[in-house]
Design a protein with these regions (language model features):
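Short, well-ordered coil/turn elements that cap or connect secondary structure elements
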Residues: 9-12, 63, 144
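Terminal low-complexity segments of carbohydrate-biosynthetic enzymes
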Residues: 63, 177-193
Length: 193
């Protein structure tokens, strides 16, 4: 972003924010706080998400009475390509496990690409995750607190270049912590909308 910073500063539709709290979770929290619109889309910058799905998200959340539109790469009508095999197997196992624990049929909690009403994201705060596990925390809080959401099939295309910062060995404990935290919040604290 440093190289593109001057370019984006000149554009009316872009704001460059200096994030004091490092990490992906800090960046997402800052983006939510500073978002100017009613809706917030979270997506990765690696071009793996389909922009046609973004248009569909926006239409659905604006026309329906939804707090969130949750995409799934693993529904009839979804297209997935170039997903690393080991990562895919772990993804499917973990998401199935989460579905069992939370007694919910949603099957793609860990996918980043979703759209939310900004006020809903503010209401479920604080978001405590500091890394990729924030993508698990947000939909778990949405679902556990009984917000209104819709699940739709989306497309995903593997990264064409560069390397992912997602490291399974490093993030496993963070995902487990988030899962336990959200489970306790749902079952012991009984926090609702």
């Amino acid at each position: 972003m440093q190289k593109q910073g001057p370019y984006f500063h000149k554009k009316k539709n872009f704001r460059v924010l200096n994030n004091i709290k490092r990490g992906l979770g800090g960046a997402i929290n800052l983006g939510i706080k500073e978002a100017l619109g009613d809706n917030v889309v979270i997506m990765m910058a690696d071009q793996s998400d389909d922009f046609n799905d973004l248009i569909n998200y926006n239409t659905l959340i604006n026309q329906g009475d939804y707090d969130a539109i949750l995409g799934s790469r693993f529904l009839r009508g979804s297209k997935v390509s170039n997903y690393p095999r080991q990562k895919l197997i772990l993804n499917r196992f973990f998401n199935y496990f989460v579905s069992l624990i939370f007694l919910n049929k949603y099957n793609d909690y860990t996918n980043a690409f979703k759209i939310y009403k900004k006020n809903t994201l503010i209401e479920i705060s604080p978001l405590i995750s500091e890394s990729f596990n924030i993508f698990l925390e947000i939909p778990l809080k949405i679902i556990s607190r009984k917000y209104k959401y819709k699940v739709i099939p989306i497309n995903w295309f593997g990264r064409a270049r560069g390397t992912s910062k997602f490291k399974i060995k490093e993030l496993g404990s963070k995902y487990l912590f988030t899962l336990i935290y959200c489970f306790i919040e749902k079952n012991l604290l009984n926090i609702k909308k």
